[in-house]
Design a protein with these regions (language model features):
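Extracytoplasmic loops and strand-loop junctions of Gram-negative outer membrane beta-barrel proteins
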Residues: 33-38, 75-77, 129-134, 165-168
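Outer-envelope beta-barrel architecture signal
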Residues: 22-30, 61-67, 104-110, 138-140, ...
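Acidic, glycine-rich flexible loop segments
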Residues: 134, 141-152
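Short glycine/proline- and aromatic-enriched beta-strand/turn motifs that initiate or cap beta-hairpins
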Residues: 19-69, 73-74, 186
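Outer-membrane beta-barrel "beta-signal"
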Residues: 177-189
């Protein structure tokens, strides 16, 4: 009788789906994201973009520390010209898990980051081709960023990231608040 019960239990255990544990503390990940500023959605085509390379370290309860390097480029129209503004930013912060399903396949997080960077206006050239003089200068930037991020596991190691963020950057002669959307991929190891 014991042999029959053991065989039945083994059949039920073998038929269940085995899933890897996710969001383990001290698990690390590398991510690559594409950044689209909010202004990119108002026109039919925009050359404004950004990229981000990130590194994350999981903490407890689905929270994690996040560090990233970003490059952002935005074109400001002036007569028939486009004046490029490039931003090189380092970010570091913490992401808090707000809600997730029981298998941790889909999660919604709130992230807060400190930002530090440098802004280059028109490739450091203040004189425009028509003779006009730019009053905007290259500057160091500092600020903070807050955003909501949806993370979805494609497999036990790959995640798709979608987020909406708003950054407040001081030190720039351009706008203070900069909303953006990001889409990316993270590899957990």
């Amino acid at each position: 009788m014991l042999r029959i019960i053991t065989c039945i239990c083994l059949c039920f255990l073998g038929g269940s789906i085995a899933q890897a544990q996710r969001l383990l503390p001290k698990q690390k990940g590398i991510s690559f994201s594409w950044i689209a500023p909010a202004e990119a959605f108002t026109s039919s085509f925009s050359d404004d973009f950004g990229v981000q390379l990130g590194y994350s370290i999981n903490a407890k309860r689905g929270n994690y520390k996040h560090f990233a390097l970003e490059y952002q480029r935005r074109l400001y129209p002036y007569k028939s010209l486009n004046i490029p503004v490039e931003r090189y930013i380092g970010a570091g912060g913490y992401s808090f898990a707000l809600i997730s399903d029981s298998s941790k396949t889909v999660a919604l997080n709130l992230g807060v980051e400190a930002l530090l960077g440098y802004e280059v206006v028109n490739h450091s050239k203040s004189l425009l081709p028509d003779g006009a003089l730019l009053t905007n200068e290259n500057n160091f930037l500092y600020g903070a960023q807050i955003g909501l991020q949806v993370e979805t596991y494609l497999s036990d190691h790959f995640l798709v990231l979608c987020s909406g963020k708003v950054a407040a950057l001081w030190g720039s002669s351009f706008e203070l608040l900069r909303p953006c959307a990001t889409v990316g991929l993270r590899y957990m190891f």
